[in-house]
């Protein structure tokens, strides 16, 4: 691959109190990773080197003090040192305002780099929502924070990815009792279009999308719930009329059987609520799951697991999901519109 075709990634550690520093260290110690992208890491240098010690590995890097121009002369990652603006030390293995504030500071820099065109995509280590809220973030999650920082008013949602299988959901972090009232043909259709667009941006020409029902056995033809008949099926039909290869609705207890093995029927599954997809994905491969911040104008990916405070600093963190997030960020950055 010629150097000009390499995607340019802005990378941050996530919450320093968790496993992010050791995951990023283990990722960048892999020569193959460094040869797949031009990387600028925004991080406290002491925390990054601590991550190296915990992971038992090192990687070369070149320090840069300014971010106005990025000179990707070779495969060596760039490091832009960023100290906590509060000047406080980071607590270990626990949520804190210091860790949350630092996470937001470094993410804001990565967003600015990518929004301005100096990088193509963002990869960040695990965040802790309690830390983010302690630091003053008043959004329900980082996806809404990203959208506000970018001034983005269009539709967006969280995608979960396992290997080559993508999932999205019509509703997300809401009480289960609220889900039926939040469903509409427009919202189901929007979720289908968002994941179709994201897969195309990651290089797949015509994604096959399976859509999940809401009720047991798809409502059994209206016997216990009409959402499949009145909302989901019409939304799927409209998506098909728009040229999207969507199919469904399928019962929630069988649709994920259709995406296993070599004869997989779908590239993506759209679910109606959070746990319909999350339970299946985590059972299929918890250590490889990736979260993509879908619908935003720039590609953003992160491992789907959390900060794992219980094992942070022990060198036991599995880099598998972070490696998958890196691969997805590279693909989406390369195909960014």
Swiss-Prot record:
* Molecular functions per Gene Ontology: 4-hydroxythreonine-4-phosphate dehydrogenase activity; metal ion binding; NAD binding
Give the source lineage, highest ranks first: Bacteria, Pseudomonadati, Pseudomonadota, Gammaproteobacteria, Pseudomonadales
Locate the residues binding a divalent metal cation: 173, 217, 274
Q: Which family does it belong to?
A: Belongs to the PdxA family.
This protein is called Putative 4-hydroxythreonine-4-phosphate dehydrogenase 2
EC annotation?
1.1.1.262
From the UniProt record, give one GO term of the biological process aspect.
pyridoxine biosynthetic process
Which reaction is this enzyme known to catalyze? 4-(phosphooxy)-L-threonine + NAD(+) = 3-amino-2-oxopropyl phosphate + CO2 + NADH
Species per Swiss-Prot/TrEMBL record: Pseudomonas aeruginosa (strain ATCC 15692 / DSM 22644 / CIP 104116 / JCM 14847 / LMG 12228 / 1C / PRS 101 / PAO1)
How the cofactor is bound: the record states: Binds 1 divalent metal cation per subunit. Can use ions such as Zn(2+), Mg(2+) or Co(2+).
Q: A Pfam family matched by this chain, by name? A: PdxA
Q: What else is known?
A: The active site is located at the dimer interface.
The function of this protein is: Catalyzes the NAD(P)-dependent oxidation of 4-(phosphooxy)-L-threonine (HTP) into 2-amino-3-oxo-4-(phosphooxy)butyric acid which spontaneously decarboxylates to form 3-amino-2-oxopropyl phosphate (AHAP).
Could you state one GO cellular component term attached to this entry? cytoplasm
Task: Enumerate the cofactors the protein uses.
Answer: Zn(2+); Mg(2+); Co(2+)
Localized where? Cytoplasm
* Pathway linked to the protein: Cofactor biosynthesis; pyridoxine 5'-phosphate biosynthesis; pyridoxine 5'-phosphate from D-erythrose 4-phosphate: step 4/5
Give the intrachain disulfide bonds. none
Please name the top-level EC class of this enzyme: oxidoreductase
Report which superkingdom the organism of origin falls in: Bacteria
Assembly, in brief, is: Homodimer.
Which key words are in the record? Cobalt, Cytoplasm, Magnesium, Metal-binding, NAD, NADP, Oxidoreductase, Pyridoxine biosynthesis, Zinc
